[in-house]
Amino acid sequence: MGPGLRPLLPLVLCVGLSALVPSAGASGFRKRGPSVTAKVFFDVRIGDKDVGRIVIGLFGKVVPKTVENFVALATGEKGYGYKGSKFHRVIKDFMIQGGDFTRGDGTGGISIYGETFPDENFKLKHYGIGWVSMANAGPDTNGSQFFITLTKPTWLDGKHVVFGKVLDGMTVVHSIELQATDGHDRPFTDCSIVNSGKIDVKTPFVVEVSDW
């Protein structure tokens, strides 16, 4: 399951956008984006080296069901989840993909609602680098797999549900991106989530969307 190259690998805002208002930014035109209501973390190991933590902000007001699924899989509260799984698909300047904790090759994974669940909405877009979206095998086939963008893949808008953004740890994401891969985009060196969990957000806060 995955975004984009589906023939090669089978699995890859009304309310929210109304809140987008212009604001000034030193690095270009910016708009206020969705509110972060929860955060999760992934502690990542590449080979036998711990490379750091990825912290992802989640937009529970826009896509509450998708966020609930992601948080539960990060904490492992249902008895299964992301801890111990790998980033199994890496395409430089496009995305890194993970979340297949049942098979580890992009053909597995399950949600907390059953094997799959429907697309919640497409109110959020793939605005640029560091946005987090659900991988799928077509409409309404969301499970546990997700990807983190390394570009602005607008061709995925309306096809994959965006639900989060990397808040900290893009250096870790880029370390995964730089791994050598085989002909199926699988890293030769394991890129593993050795620990994962939830970080409480006492007061929701807004992320900015740049240059779109």
From Swiss-Prot:
Coiled coil: none annotated. Gene3D superfamilies: Cyclophilin-like (2.40.100.10). One of its GO terms (biological process) is protein folding. Its EC number is 5.2.1.8. It is an enzyme of class 5 (isomerase). It comes from the Eukaryota. GO terms for molecular function: cyclosporin A binding; peptidyl-prolyl cis-trans isomerase activity. Residues 41-198 form the PPIase cyclophilin-type domain. It catalyses: [protein]-peptidylproline (omega=180) = [protein]-peptidylproline (omega=0). Inhibited by cyclosporin A (CsA). Its main location: cytoplasm. PPIase that catalyzes the cis-trans isomerization of proline imidic peptide bonds in oligopeptides and may therefore assist protein folding. This is Peptidyl-prolyl cis-trans isomerase C. It comes from Bos taurus.
